[in-house]
Design a protein with these regions (language model features):
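Hydrophobic anchor residue at the start of the ABC signature
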Residues: 9
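Conserved signature/switch motifs of ABC ATPase nucleotide-binding domains
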Residues: 15
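Catalytic Walker B motif of ABC-type/P-loop ATPase nucleotide-binding domains
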Residues: 20-23
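Helix N-cap at the start of a conserved alpha-helix in ABC-type nucleotide-binding domains
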Residues: 31-33
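Helical segment within the ABC ATPase nucleotide-binding domain
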Residues: 35-47
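H-loop/switch region of ABC-family ATPase nucleotide-binding domains
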Residues: 55-56
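A short, surface-exposed alpha-helical micro-motif characterized by mixed small hydrophobic
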Residues: 61-63
Length: 104
């Protein structure tokens, strides 16, 4: 689970990438393992690693992202800094998504 994700991140770092891409890195993990992977990614962000991350982990996105891009049906619906995206989204679809995700 989480250890495999961390090993995959470490292997990727061996290639000295300028950008790392993550596609739902926590989706298949047990809840207890999610924080381990997110902590590793937060560490990368703190070291200045550029990351493009597809995630439903809204707390992580709010904390780490410079920009949040919300997509629906393969289209960009909204793009904004986290402070604006989470506090005052423009698009109704974004508002609906956030109300459903952040209500729990």
């Amino acid at each position: 689970g989480g250890q495999q994700q961390r090993v995959a991140i470490a292997r990727s770092l061996c290639m000295n990438p300028q950008v790392m891409l993550f596609d739902e890195p926590t989706s298949a993990l047990d809840p207890e393992m999610i924080s381990e992977v997110l902590d590793a990614m937060i560490g990368l962000a703190e070291q200045g690693m550029t990351m493009i991350c597809v995630t439903h982990e809204m707390g992580f996105a709010r904390k780490v992202a410079d920009q949040v891009v919300f997509m629906d049906g393969g289209q960009i619906i909204e793009q904004a800094p986290p402070s604006k995206f989470f506090a005052n989204p423009n698009n109704e679809r974004t508002k609906l998504f956030l109300s459903q995700i952040l209500s729990h």
